[in-house]
Amino acid sequence: MAAVKRIVVLPGDHIGREVVEEAVKVLGAVEQSLSDVHFDFQYHLVGGAAIDATGSALPDEALGAAKEADAVLLGAVGGPKWQGGAVRPEQGLLKLRQELGVYANLRPCNFAADSLLELSPLRPEIARDTDIMVVRELLGGSYFGERHEDEGDGVAWDTDKYTVKEVQRIARMAGFLALQHDPPLPVWSLDKANVLASSRLWRKTVEETFQSEFPNVQLQHQLIDSAAMILVKNPRAFNGVVVTSNMFGDIISDEASVIPGSLGLLPSASLASLPDSKSAFGLYEPCHGSAPDLPAGKANPIGCILSAAMMLKLSLNMVAAGEAVEQAVQEVLDSGVRTGDLLGSSSTSEVGDAIALAVKEALRRQSAAGLS
């Protein structure tokens, strides 16, 4: 009997709907190639689409389904239509993350195919072999701290608050990921400990956690502003795992995202626990936004497709299938089937079609070699 994997699909707004469709198409190709798995896709509204239909950016029905799922696949939320309202699409995404307890946001920065090197804004000799995993704390800091809006007095403030437990668990995620390699990957912790009290607690806690629990992992600390400079000057200096707070992680991962040539390429996973059993609950979404100005058929679906690959590897205990998707993406990019952001002429669906076909062939090769 085939194992049922329940996946809640939240397309969201604008290009979110398009890229999710292609990721589901690729997952469908995986299912068609394997006899022992069935994907149960359950679609729900989130973001602006949910506001229009229900008045809420995250309807109770969608949240309830997400909590019962094995994993959640999300497209993108937001757009100018909803920015002036009392309820904003982004509120739904923040609530979803908080309610699901996904405290660790994993954002890889690497080249999905070597042929993309020429598209990097950095010189090839600088960008080549960049391979960074940014681990962003997702449920603390200024995005969730106490705040005061300007109410006519000309004053507004946010609170960047962290507890030892919050820092410990994200440090453990970074240490765990480092230990998945032999030898262990180095870990860089980014903070602003020369100015911020929260960063001093961060640095102290990360240091103590690694000393007691990950003594064989090389840990280095770097101030966030100098890290931003180094990332452009010599990104390979951070090859390994980079762990940092919510706001700093948001910024540094977006900076890193341009290195491979397009934000549309990069996936992300937000996990509620260590993926030590390859079955951690996770929320998966591309790093890009909803791009409301982009015409239909122009969006790059690869970031969402690679997010689905991460889901297979980290939440659905289907590591070989996830690797097959990654291999298919590489082959399709190398063949020249690309969207306009990568100087190609293929549509969103054409890229998805090509990757789905390549996935079937990659899984056939795995089966022939006895690897699946």
UniProtKB/Swiss-Prot annotation:
Species of the source: Eremothecium gossypii (strain ATCC 10895 / CBS 109.51 / FGSC 9923 / NRRL Y-1056)
GO molecular function, one term: magnesium ion binding
Protein's UniProt name: 3-isopropylmalate dehydrogenase
One Pfam family named in its UniProt record: Iso_dh
GO terms for cellular component: cytosol
Organism ancestry: Eukaryota, Fungi, Dikarya, Ascomycota, Saccharomycotina
Family: Belongs to the isocitrate and isopropylmalate dehydrogenases family.
Entry function: Catalyzes the oxidation of 3-carboxy-2-hydroxy-4-methylpentanoate (3-isopropylmalate) to 3-carboxy-4-methyl-2-oxopentanoate. The product decarboxylates to 4-methyl-2 oxopentanoate.
Annotated compartments: Cytoplasm
Binding site for Mg(2+): D225, D250, D254
Disulfide-linked positions: none
InterPro entries: IsoCit/isopropylmalate_DH_CS, IsoPropMal-DH-like_dom, Isopropylmalate_DH
Cofactor binding note of this UniProt entry: Binds 1 Mg(2+) or Mn(2+) ion per subunit.
Site for Important for catalysis, residues: Y143, K192
Biological process, per Gene Ontology: L-leucine biosynthetic process
